[in-house]
Amino acid sequence: MKHGFIKVAAAAPEIRVADPMFNADAVIRAMDEHARLGVKVLVFPELTLTGATCGDLFYQNTLLAGAAAALEKVVKASEGKDMLVFVGLPVAQGAKVYDAAAAVCNGELLGVVPASCPGDKHFALPGALLDDIQIGSLGPVDFHPQQLFQHSEVSELNVAVLVGADVSASVSPAVRHALAGATVLVEMAGFPMATDSACRMTTAVRAESAKLHAGVVLAAPGFGESSTDATYSGLCLIAEDGKVLESAEDGCSDVVTELDVQLLIAARRKDATFTGDAASYVVTEWGEGVEETVLTRPFGKYPYRPDDPADYHAAAKRLLHMQAASLVRRMQYANLKHPVVGISGGVDSTLAVIICAEAVKMMGLPADYVNAVTMPCFGTTDRTKSNAIIVSEQLGATVRVIDIGESVMQHFKDIGHDPENRNVVYENAQARERTQILMDVANGFADGGIHVGTEDMSEFADGWCTYNGDHISMYDVNAGSTKTMVQMVVRYVAETTDDQVLAKALLDVLDTPVSPELLPPTRNGEIAQKSEDSVGPYNLQDFFLYYLVDHGFAPEKVLRLADTAYGDEFDHATLKKWLRSYCRRLFSQQFKRSCLQDGPTLNGFSFSPRTGFLMPSDGSDALYLASVDALK
């Protein structure tokens, strides 16, 4: 459970209808198996100990007493297991029978939760408040539909349960539970199999977990339930904040994975609509200490891309449209006709010129209204210059080549800088000269021009840009896109265009090292200044951006996730080195982010100084660097 990872499971063992002791044995076997796996929350279907299809037998004292005895057996078998188990059974209270879930942990019955919305005529509504309940020799314990089971050591782990028809109720108790603080919603379902049941429930669980920023663990009845009028599939699902992590439907299903409750809390903190309280809830503690959870779930290397590469094209198409549409809106508002973009042959400027081409197309303007300006200087290579021109020409843009070498040398002379001194002045003078040219070219159009920026969010995060140089534009279409997102969109265009000349150039752009090209090339004419040698691989940078900045995880947890995702590429020491570098640059380069121009937010996170991630320009990095340095 360290770092907020909780191993959870949903199980639908084969049962016998109206045979509580047989079913208790099935539950106990599953408990033993999952305890060995380190599971901390185990969920069974509705009415596990009797079966959900007993009909009027639910009124029979014999079945009710048998279910109580079976629960006693399960509770006793849970001794020594630090695992919260939810098992279903019918319970009698006075003249009423209730569809209920028993919460069991380490030899104790912690509470009994009746269904808030019983969907079977045999079961009663629980009312607002019920007395404590005694089940056989167990209890008395709380008997209330509004209960939270809070871990004694992991404050973010609060579990609430939905029983039977609660799972699909039009006004679901899940909302109330989540607003009261439940981060894990246990759903003990009882629905039969239908042609669309798996699809329907998967969609519902995904949506519910996303809306409530919750983990959902669902188990539905499987083999052994009566087939008199229906078939039961044993559907089991585990979802987290809109993503289905595990699912199975094979009659006797069983799924296990880890939920990240820290991720859920991070999402809720940023959701201003997420307000509520637990005043009406009974809160019961469970659990003993914090253990290291062995991670079995995969963590992708590209968190800003879809999990499934098969979805890349659809995501890239949507991103491209969003970026182009945002530029169209700005140009229409300001009555501008000519987007002006500086092209370098790098991936960011390549995407920017593609976006500009798409924007003028959407506006019904000629393709040559796009002005692509390449400004070679001391570090420009033939490869990047050639690719920049080919891409722009194939898109139909007007290409201008303006060599800035002479201008920069004159500038050096004016300020008394020795051009042999290749320090930050040598580099930044080139970037600022380019920005001045692009601004002035845009201003030169009688019917309006706009300097379109190319800098992406990854470079704003690490500050790998020249202040008041490539850092500034009139509108930055890449401001909300990370480097790995930019690469995905450029690859999408390369793989879907019918223009093979364009495709070849785009693929070569993707294969070109990321570089500002501000230092002279090698003797062989190759790029000498490679960004990733200075600031680290952009795949890693985007990974750190997602978990450290976007989700607010501690460096220790971020490094653990990086080891999990990138252990096949980088050793632990290398990952730690680049994480430390990232933390340092995140703070030291904030002054550049504090004055960013407008640009679209594309994935819910940005560095906009108006609506995005905000921090002071002079904040201390000491705490973060000390946290990284303390890691082994």
Regions found by a protein language model. Give the residues of each.
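ATP/NTP-dependent adenylation/nucleotidyl-transfer catalytic domains that generate, transfer
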Residues: I6, S155, H213-A214, S226, ...
